[in-house]
Amino acid sequence: MVLGDKKRAERNRTLTISQDEIPTLSRMVSSKNDALSSGITDTIINADLMDVIDAIPDKCANLIIVDPPYNLSKDFHGVTFNAMSSDSYEEYLREWFYKVCDKLSDNGTLYMCGDWKCTSSMQKVISERLSIINRITWQREKGRGAMSNWKNGMEDIWFAVKKTNDYYFNVEAVMTKRRVLAPYRDNGKPKDWDETENGNFRTTYPSNFWDDISVPFWSMPENTDHPTQKPEKLYAKLVLASSKPGDLVFDPFLGSGTSAVVAKKLNRHYCGIEINKEYCLWAAKRIMNSETDKEIQGYQDGVFWERNTLNIQKKGNYKKPRELNTVCQQPSLFS
């Protein structure tokens, strides 16, 4: 069997795994016992989260990214999740979330992804253990329309910490570059924007509304057949803002490995737990590929570009973001 073996168009770049690659990739995936005997740094652990979480060292992770099953009935290539009542879903979250929080360092950060249906349950459970700093809304621009409802094109990402007066947040590492539609000049000179032969652009501070990130699709080399894969660009913002090089990024629902791949590309360590062996192999191949390909689509020379600017990024005729002091210890936003 070839993993991800479907009939695909010639230009389709979705990840596949050949039969010959499986032994090599399997050696990159740890079982529960292997991981616990040799350490968790830079590991993919193929196990049920509840079977292994107690053995993960407490306070080991500087950043935790959580993309759990939403409260929807879905088949993850043989591993199914069934929708339940809101109360039952909250109890499901508590079963593992409290334990996951124990793995967060005292000045660490946790992000959790959710959709409109489960996000209120997530907010409630997160607040029982951590302090919520903000909610990011990601406009993912994908999803089927409906005749009797609005198309679901948004997801939430909850931003939470243990200590509101002591957590790392580097906003200068996640600046965004956008086209200037109505450029303003002061004495004939561009004001707060750059004028280039490829267009007018402004480097700005990011907000909590993200509309510059596409869901992975068939022409992107990061794409897999995972039904709910998150984009590398999305996780790159979280990793760059809330961790330092050499920090450990922990993902208890690794899926096809986006958090681990991004961590490696950005010189962080990773640890991920995933129950589906096939997904673990996809993650392993993506990590192997990242040894020679560090590109994160939409992130170029230390700045995040808006959609549909790839050709301009490659031309490189623009100003890089100014060099700024990147150490930021944030006060509470709610005091």
Task: Please give the residue ranges for each predicted region.
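Core catalytic lobe of class I
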Residues: 1-24, 31-282, 328-335
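S-adenosyl-L-methionine
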Residues: 21-54, 284-325
